[in-house]
Curated annotation (Swiss-Prot):
Top-rank taxon, per record: Bacteria
Residues making up the signal peptide according to the UniProt record: 1-20
Native species: Streptococcus pneumoniae serotype 4 (strain ATCC BAA-334 / TIGR4)
Stated name of the protein: Foldase protein PrsA
Subcellular location(s) of the protein: Cell membrane
Membrane topology per record: Lipid-anchor
Length: 313
């Protein structure tokens, strides 16, 4: 899931280990000083109400529940492949990036594994809901491949200047893309890219504008959300090829299935409902009042006691 389900590992002592020491024992000494000590139990009592500590316990619970239910269905190679992609992306900075996030390679692997287990659970439920109605809705919203040339710029005034040149008679749009575009993936190929309505390579605003163009038409400047917070990027699009949409839904059945499943994976409400059902099925019992509310985002509030109860035993 493009959205990370679990928060980055926290550099607190294991909440579970500390909890085991919280009843009937002060546990081991963590810190000693002249005339005093800080014990595991004392530390646990201090940190258990901390939101970060509560998130750790929530993550640990989700990890254990989904590992038990789906662990045998997930190949370790999927986790290793994701790690390899991240190493390729960050290069020699990978360990530093992990450290800054409070993670080691092993905790990152565990995080990725849990995310993939949740994705697997979501996929299973979503596939069971692949109704004719769902396919029809996806088909109605689907636009097949178009090929376009795009120019991406970071400055609106610059974009307006380039647009004027792009709309001039005899303009060489490909050369304008090579000379001006900030999109390194497409500029050397004259800005050419092929995408459909399900593609994620270009922003929604750009796709919408491209689909509305006739072949050889050039858009106005399109403003889209940038990759940095509160930033914008500016696009100019020339449509070079448009695929006629078939009226036969069966021609797109596999593509539509992928579209529907991807939408479900990106639907936070749907994902939360799946996590909630698995937590309920696991019959979770909260043993410390400090943690009684950590599951409410998944299994509701005070009336969820039938599946997640608090016990002082």
């Amino acid at each position: 899931m493009k959205k990370k389900l679990l928060a980055g590992a926290i550099t607190l002592l294991s909440v579970a280990t500390l909890a085991a020491c919280s009843k009937g024992s002060e546990g081991a000494d963590l810190i000693s000083m002249k005339g005093d000590v800080i014990t595991e139990h004392q530390f646990y009592e201090q940190v258990k109400s901390n939101p970060s500590a509560q998130q750790v316990l929530l993550n640990m619970t989700i990890q254990k529940v989904f590992e038990k239910q789906y662990g045998s269905e997930l190949d370790d190679k999927e986790v290793d492949d994701t790690i390899a992609e991240e190493k390729k992306q960050y290069g020699e900075n990978y360990q530093r990036v992990l450290s800054q996030a409070g993670m080691t390679l092993e905790t990152r692997k565990a995080q990725i594994r849990t995310s993939k287990l949740v994705e697997l659970a979501v996929k299973k439920v979503a596939e069971a809901e692949l109704t004719d109605e769902a396919y029809k809705k996806a088909f109605d919203e689907y636009t097949p491949d178009v090929t376009a040339q795009i120019i991406r710029l970071n400055n609106e005034d610059k974009a307006k200047e380039v647009l004027e040149k792009a709309k001039a008679e005899g303009a060489d749009f490909a050369q304008l893309a090579k000379d001006n575009s900030t999109d390194e993936k497409t500029k050397e190929n004259g800005g050419e890219i092929t995408f459909d309505s399900a593609s994620t390579e270009v922003p929604e605003q750009v796709k919408k504008a491209a689909f509305a163009l006739d072949v050889d038409g050039v858009s106005d400047v399109i403003t889209a959300t940038g990759t940095q917070a509160y930033s914008s990027q500016y696009y100019i699009v020339k449509l070079t090829k448009k695929t006629e949409k078939s009226s036969n839904i069966d021609d797109y059945k596999e593509k539509l299935k992928t579209v529907i499943l991807t939408q479900k994976q990106n639907d936070s409400t749907f994902v939360q409902s799946i996590i909630g059902k698995e937590l309920q099925a696991a019959n979770i019992k909260v043993k410390d009042q400090a943690f009684q509310n950590i599951f409410t985002q998944y299994i509701g509030g005070g009336d969820s006691s039938s599946s997640s109860s608090t016990s002082n035993e």
